[in-house]
């Protein structure tokens, strides 16, 4: 096996609520424009850590928001939903997940 054929190590960062992302970092991680992240905030899909800031440049997001944002953006893309519809569907899917978890926990 040559060096070029050698497997490369997988490097990653575990994102949780202790890690904070800027709006630019979140949009880059989601591979979308900042405007799409702003739309998710406006619809209440995701919320900045300190929501009082008016400018998106000042927003910071907990790392665990990344998964929710990606899921909402995937719903928008796959089903051609606007941000409001994606927020509704995402909320319903999360309720289903919670009900299934509660049922399994009995």
Locate predicted features.
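Arg/Lys-rich, alpha-helical DNA-contact motif
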Residues: 2-24, 34-38, 42-106
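Residues within the alpha-helical elements of helix-turn-helix
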Residues: 29
């Amino acid at each position: 096996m040559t060096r070029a054929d050698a497997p490369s190590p997988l490097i990653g960062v575990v994102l949780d609520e202790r890690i904070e992302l800027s709006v630019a970092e979140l949009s880059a991680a989601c591979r979308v424009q900042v405007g799409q992240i702003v739309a998710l905030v406006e619809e209440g899909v995701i919320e900045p850590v300190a929501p009082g800031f008016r400018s998106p440049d000042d927003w910071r997001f907990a790392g665990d928001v990344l998964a929710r944002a990606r899921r909402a953006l995937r719903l928008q893309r796959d089903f051609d939903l606007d941000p409001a519809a994606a927020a509704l569907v995402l909320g319903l899917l999360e309720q289903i997940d919670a009900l299934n978890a509660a049922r399994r926990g009995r």
